[in-house]
Amino acid sequence: METLNVDHEDTISSEQEHRAHTKSDTDMPPISGGRDFIRQFAAESKKLWWLAGPAIFTSFCQYSLGAVTQILAGHVNTLALAAVSIQNSVISGFSVGIMLGMGSALATLCGQAYGAGQLEMMGIYLQRSWIILNSCALLLCLFYVFATPLLSLLGQSPEISKAAGKFSLWMIPQLFAYAVNFATAKFLQAQSKVIAMAVIAATVLLQHTLLSWLLMLKLRWGMAGGAVVLNMSWWLIDVTQIVYICGGSSGRAWSGLSWMAFKNLRGFARLSLASAVMVCLEVWYFMALILFAGYLKNPQVSVAALSICMNILGWPIMVAFGFNAAVSVRESNELGAEHPRRAKFLLIVAMITSVSIGIVISVTLIVLRDKYPAMFSDDEEVRVLVKQLTPLLALTIVINNIQPVLSGVAVGAGWQGIVAYVNIGCYYLCGIPIGLVLGYKMELGVKGIWTGMLTGTVVQTSVLLFIIYRTNWKKEASLAEARIKKWGDQSNKREEIDLCEEDENNSNGENNHRK
């Protein structure tokens, strides 16, 4: 019992030291002029890129795992390529949207806890997220098990549905790997352990490429070989990250498994569900764009051209996701440390940087609009349509570089529920109806559908900008402190009370024994 008291006192004193260190790093002073703005901008940019650079690289590497399998499947046969593509985009994509969203709740809590010095609770949050995400994965297994009839219901051919259904069954282990990874990644990002994540992702990608080639093509295992390697690669990322955490890299943020992880799961699940709704409404919105294009008069050309544009859009989105992760970490850290002025300023820095990147990419595409479509298709109709869609693609890239930054702020501040309502109104009550009217009623085809849905994105971005503009950042810092107390301090107090009661019981027992 004495050992427990000593350990607990050490934990409290070390926590106070970290809190004192955090509080000594005071909020930034008001900007006094142009030179001061440039100096503060450069300093904040350095912090953002320190997080965003490795986060972008990690996203590229993990995105490439599925891409490598898909490319090699094309060298097996056409059916294998179709099956892997459908499973990856529809079945797996649906699940990823839900679990990635649920995992973002951890970004809010861990980021704010780290900023406030409540390091011990971060490991508890991680374990709670593991429990909730794996429970969610268990439910999502139904989509994998019944993938064949679901794909047939969506209009896929019997051959593709059957092959994709078989591949989906093989990919169930990856689903649970996602559940572990999405939580672990947020835990590491909150502590700025992004370099380690990048090294792990790059190493796994190299072995994944080699083993996929060996099993799928050289040994002729086909889709089965791809499933084996893809499952193994994702679990290798998970195991390596967990070993890295348990090896002491996270310090007091990881103190081992605890029964505390099973407390207050209902409240944690509510925040996770709000996060999932926010992300899913965004992911499914663009999935609907391709679905609607398949019902146009010339669906082959429309879907082919749109797929090319979506593939191009995917790479800038990886950059935007890196900024999303960096902004959510920095925002939650600063709010947790009660630095409202710095939290507001980093949003300005992230917006300017992200928009600048989007403009450069968009201008490049517009300049090369006569040439780049030939890299993706030999069909003249498809090339012409891609060229016509390039201005919309360029504008979408700029808007999409703004939107993830705003979403990162929302995650960092814990606004997932508010953003979910905004997404429903802007995307599904505004964007999709306008797109359907322009595409079908006014016969503008895929350009009309895309224009309408882009309108929804612009409205959503405008609403988020207005919300952020009207935000009282001092109040948000206070709310972050209250949230940390709700999720952390109360648990620590309960732990202290339990220890004190146990001490008193033991002391009374010893006194009675002496008597």
From Swiss-Prot:
Comp. bias (Basic and acidic residues): 1-26, 488-497
Annotated localization: Membrane
GO cellular component, one term: membrane
Listed Low complexity bias regions: 506-515
Species, as recorded: Arabidopsis thaliana (Mouse-ear cress)
Protein name according to UniProt: Protein DETOXIFICATION 32
Pfam families cross-referenced by the UniProt entry: MatE
Residue stretches in coiled coil: none
Family the entry assigns: Belongs to the multi antimicrobial extrusion (MATE) (TC 2.A.66.1) family.
GO biological process, one term: xenobiotic detoxification by transmembrane export across the plasma membrane
Source lineage: Eukaryota, Viridiplantae, Streptophyta, Embryophyta, Tracheophyta
UniProtKB keywords: Membrane, Transmembrane, Transmembrane helix, Transport
Transmembrane spans: 48-68, 90-110, 131-151, 167-187, 194-214, 225-245, 276-296, 303-323, 347-367, 392-412, 418-438, 448-468
Region (Disordered): 1-30, 488-515
Molecular-function annotations in GO: antiporter activity; xenobiotic transmembrane transporter activity
Membrane topology type: Multi-pass membrane protein
Chief place of localization: membrane
PANTHER family: MULTIDRUG RESISTANCE PROTEIN
The keyword Lipid biosynthesis is annotated on this UniProt entry: no
InterPro entries: MATE_euk, MATE_fam
